């Protein structure tokens, strides 16, 4: 840490749990780095928050972030969806396809919202203009969808810290965690999860003790 900044509030951290400190303990990090396509990263200077869901391919040594969004409000007339934003910044991008996370991640969504514009002027929320708001309601959890209208990937881990990519970088490697049982994972300090997403983590041999306290 730079001298004289111990009492500062920062926008991202490479320490365990990121700037929001979503891990009380020191989780188990998977061995080795996993390469992430820079196009999948938030636009600089925004960052991917600690606790972001990921799918890591052990064979290919690649990693795909799975972005989730907590809906704060929906304007059906303007076709806008207001979503929670962390200190790490905006993670949505124009062209991103979003679906409501259902009870079964293997099901394709009937309704898909494609982001056409983003108002990121507020500190704590982003307002997403979309082509349709059908099926989206307050407090719903949205996730980025793939071409098959299912969640982009089934998660098998969480990021251990905040991650940002420099505008001059041509590649980035990201480490992920799969185990944090000794102390709780504070889910209210991380991107939103659903029961189905937690089940997917368990099914993929991830071991987390989630806590709903702040």
Regions from the PLM with identified roles:
Residues 1-214:
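Surface-exposed, low-hydrophobicity beta-strand/loop segments enriched in small/polar/acidic residues
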